[in-house]
UniProtKB/Swiss-Prot annotation:
Keywords: Disulfide bond, Hydroxylation, Neurotoxin, Secreted, Toxin. Chi-conotoxins inhibit the neuronal noradrenaline transporter (NET/SLC6A2). Belongs to the conotoxin T superfamily. Disulfide bonds join C2-C11, C3-C8. It comes from Conus marmoreus. Expressed by the venom duct. The modification 4-hydroxyproline is found at P10. It is found in: Secreted. GO terms for cellular component: extracellular region. The cysteine framework is X (CC-CX[hydroxyPro]C). This is Chi-conotoxin CMrVIA.
């Protein structure tokens, strides 16, 4: 899952 600014990590 991608969230934040151009960062992909578990939300």
């Amino acid at each position: 899952v991608c969230c934040g600014y151009k960062l992909c990590h578990p939300c």
